[in-house]
Amino acid sequence: MVPTRNRPMLRILGFFICAAFIYLSFRDLWLNHKGKAKLGFVKRNGTQFVVDDKPLYVNGWNSYWFMDHAVDEHSRNLVGEMLEAGAKMGLTVCRTWAFNDGGYNALQISPGRFDERVFQALDHVIAEARKHDVRLLLSLVNNLQAYGGKTQYVKWAWQEGVGLSSSNDSFFFDPSIRNYFKNYLKVLLTRKNSVTGIEYRNDPTIFAWELINEPRCTTDVSGKTLQDWIDEMTGFIKSIDDKHLLTVGLEGFYGPNSPKGLTVNPEQWASQLGTDFVQNSNSSNIDFASVHIYPDHWFHNQTFEEKLKFVVKWMQSHIEDGLKELKKPVLFTEFGLSNQNKDYEPSQRDKFYRIIFDVVYKSAKRKKSGAGTLVWQLFMEGMETFNDDFGIVPHEQDSIYKLMIEQSCRLGKVTGRLKEQKLKELCSHRH
């Protein structure tokens, strides 16, 4: 039994022990989220990305599945594990979906109705990225049907009796649907992160916003419909958030308004999609251009070597456009080689990656507009069902793993960032 005279002292001691425990428990969380509040926003200086007035060339990846996995507590850990794996390779930017419209684990259940549980999952993704010093390129809607996309918006309009057309492309011209999307944008941009306490529009963890993944508007091949939509939506975004960079999310095809580029397109069909790389990227509120690289999807009868030649020509054309026409950075936001090709060999993927990395590295050395690449896609062990023939698990293909680290080191040398501790350690042990 404790003597009565000692009880006040024990209470005081207990209080300080409890306070110390709470401090130690939450110190790392506080440092990870609050202590990095001075992280600089990525900006644009001509054809270069800059952070704190220093050039930034991107070596990154795609993991579109982050928010979806963060909803479930049993799979949430995969987000942090993937970000940690990326950071250990010196990767600096991850592109992921900030949308899920209708369907399972929907962020937006119906126009203007959001699932707080899913929003908190996205909060977690952003907080984890901040923790691992990785920035996020967040895509805002899908042109494809996966995760809802423009098709879901059109369905909503029809269900509410306000749709003008059953065409999926009415997403771009229907006033009611435009208002649906604007409402979503406003809610997302002004969202206060439940983990960090920072509004999305004020969070430098977000590298940039991507307006739409792979837009196409085949009902108007002139490109006017899509261009009007881009101009309106980018202006709306900038009126709410003028701190973050903004890109369209293009595949990079040239339209009728860019006759010189038509010879660079993979085939004639690419000019009939209602998009135009130069015109769309030249919109005044667009800060950098985006391009994809998928010769497997775009050609059916070419040999592997012919595809490699196309890739170099494709990339160089867009880099020159960025330098001379747009005067903006060009980021290759998706690239991949399918392992389901006839006569596929793992060494082909090595060659494919090497050529793409080399083009960007040479552009960076010459201070041209090639601003970086994002591999499609990376995932973790046990996620084979998410592999769309392009996916890679870090470490499983050692040659690719080493190529990605080498690119991080090469770009770090160009920018002078090799002196930064994490990159210095990574690159000094590379050999």
From Swiss-Prot:
GO terms for molecular function: mannan endo-1,4-beta-mannosidase activity. Keywords: Glycoprotein, Glycosidase, Hydrolase, Secreted, Signal. The keyword Metal-binding does not apply. It catalyses: Random hydrolysis of (1->4)-beta-D-mannosidic linkages in mannans, galactomannans and glucomannans. Glycans are attached at N45, N168, N282, N301. Expressed in stems. This is Mannan endo-1,4-beta-mannosidase 5. It is found in: Secreted. The gene is MAN5.
